[in-house]
């Protein structure tokens, strides 16, 4: 069981176009491929890595905080899917389990004591082989 690198930052926005324009035009990230989720958004890449995920909340009742933006969660690459589930349960933490459309990525979501959402991403092929 181990924890890997920070994979991406997720930002909720009520102005997706301006947000994409800033991060691509001003900062130099690249707007790229994104799974076919049921909600609108964009994935921005640095090289081959989707380091920023944007979620468009303009058509919802949810509002992004304007002070610093609205950072939704922090994500890490991980391995040991079943071990993490057992450990989190054993420590009394509730978690949510998800599979990304296409099935190549398994995820666990858990909140820290401050309410910050932590996303753990597991390569499904590696987990099945373990």
For every predicted segment, state its role.
Residues 2, 85-86, 90-130:
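Vicinal oxygen chelate
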Residues 1-17, 71-74, 126-130:
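N-terminal beta-strand motif that seeds the catalytic metal site of vicinal oxygen chelate
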Residues 67, 73-88:
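Mid-chain, well-packed structural core segment of small domains
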Residues 5, 38, 70, 104:
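Exposed loop/turn and edge beta-strand positions of beta-sandwich/beta-sheet ligand-binding modules
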Residues 10-12, 45, 75-77, 111:
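Short hydrophobic/aromatic beta-strand micro-patches
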Residues 8, 52-53, 73, 107:
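Histidine-centered active-site/metal-ligand motif
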Residues 12-51:
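Core segments of cupin and vicinal oxygen chelate
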């Amino acid at each position: 069981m181990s924890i890997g690198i920070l994979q991406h930052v997720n930002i909720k926005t009520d102005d997706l176009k301006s947000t994409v324009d800033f991060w691509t035009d001003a900062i130099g990230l690249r707007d790229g491929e994104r799974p076919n989720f049921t909600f609108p958004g964009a994935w921005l890449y640095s090289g081959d890595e989707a380091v920023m995920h944007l979620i468009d909340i303009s058509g919802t009742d949810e509002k992004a905080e304007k002070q610093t933006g609205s950072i939704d969660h922090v994500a890490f690459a991980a391995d040991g899917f079943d071990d993490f589930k057992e450990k989190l349960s054993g420590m009394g933490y509730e978690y949510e389990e998800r599979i990304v459309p296409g099935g190549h990525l398994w995820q666990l979501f858990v909140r820290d004591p401050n309410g910050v959402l932590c996303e753990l991403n597991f390569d499904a092929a590696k987990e099945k082989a373990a």
